[in-house]
């Protein structure tokens, strides 16, 4: 039974998973937020401004991509990352949800977070924030943010 569970749910390297989530939420997520646009109205306006395929009546190679198409694909993918990130934060427990929302959605500093929530600095960094980031890794479903321990003590990432 344990072998089946290990194959379905391999052992997670907690420290490296926490670091991976910090990187995702601190670096990748802000980029995707900027790339996604601010509101659905902005998105609709952006689509309307993009040029459609240029048609001049001459035969063209069908494999050539239009820059507008690539821009739309990047924007839609960024919007999915933003949407799934917010959903994942919302699925965490109340303390983790509050912390992750303040830190990564409202752009609070870590100091502002632990002072607002009311934890000591050491308890925040040693327990509360790592726990919140591990919960986020469990609830984020677009990509696997976990870093796994393999049988040979090597690590592998789902991302």
Residue ranges of predicted features:
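Amphipathic alpha-helical recognition patches that constitute DNA-binding helices
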Residues: 20, 123-124
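A short pre-motif secondary-structure segment
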Residues: 99-100
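N-terminal interaction/assembly modules
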Residues: 1-89, 142-159
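Helix-turn-helix DNA-binding module
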Residues: 106-123
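DNA major-groove recognition helices of helix-turn-helix
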Residues: 124-143
């Amino acid at each position: 039974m344990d072998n089946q569970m290990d194959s379905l749910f391999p052992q997670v390297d907690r420290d490296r998973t926490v670091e991976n989530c910090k990187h995702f939420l601190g670096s990748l997520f802000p980029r995707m937020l900027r790339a996604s646009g601010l509101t659905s109205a902005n998105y609709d306006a952006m689509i309307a401004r993009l040029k459609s395929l240029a048609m001049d009546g001459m035969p063209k190679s069908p494999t050539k991509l239009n820059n507008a198409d690539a821009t739309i694909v990047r924007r839609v993918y960024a919007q999915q990352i933003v949407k799934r990130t917010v959903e994942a934060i919302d699925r965490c427990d109340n303390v983790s949800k509050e912390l992750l929302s303040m830190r990564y959605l409202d752009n609070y500093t870590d100091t502002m977070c632990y002072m607002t929530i009311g934890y000591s600095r050491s308890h925040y960094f040693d327990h509360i924030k790592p726990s919140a980031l591990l919960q986020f890794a469990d609830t984020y479903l677009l990509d696997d943010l976990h870093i796994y321990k393999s049988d040979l003590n090597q690590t592998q990432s789902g991302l």
